[in-house]
Amino acid sequence: MIFKGNFLYTPALGELTVREGEYLVVEGEKCAGFYRALPQEYAGQPVTDFGRALVLPAFCDLHLHAPQMVNRGVGYDQELLPWLETYTFPVEARYGDTDFAEAAWKRFLNRMWANGTLRFSAFATIHKEAAWRLMELTEQAGLSALIGKVNMDRNAPDSL
């Protein structure tokens, strides 16, 4: 695969590299190199040209709660337990409904793609079918994830 664009990446801690208007050649799953001019050996191969766009590496999120994405941005005025009781527990209980869960998971996975988060470690809910469906949809979306269920046995309602 060959890409052309403006690439920004960090090859080492504290180091930032910008490559403007260059070609990135990928062979298999590895970067074969960046080039100002495309080497003759790659002539005639298709090039994905991103124009003036900035191309960034994907992000990895190592700790997130997938079911809480539907209530993100609410309740910043509350401490943790009141926030859980007011917003999180009621919405997480709804994941027992597989139709609700599927729609929510699809929105969640679209958000991961939109944010450039292609790998993540996520908690689902205690609902087995919903958790399995999140795993299936994640794979279908072309994302990589470690997905587990929450094991909370204190300060949670009986529904969770």
Kindly give the residue locations of the regions a language model identified.
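Active-site beta-loop-alpha junctions enriched in small/polar residues
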Residues: 65, 125-126, 150-155
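Hydrophobic faces of well-ordered beta-strands that scaffold small-molecule active sites
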Residues: 58-62, 120-122, 145-149
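A short, flexible beta-alpha/helix-coil linker loop
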Residues: 8, 90, 152-155
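N-terminal metal-binding scaffold of metallo-dependent hydrolase/deaminase domains
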Residues: 1-42, 53
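Alpha-helical scaffold segments that flank or form the walls of functional sites
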Residues: 72-143
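Active-site-proximal beta-alpha core segment in soluble small-molecule metabolic enzymes
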Residues: 132, 146-160
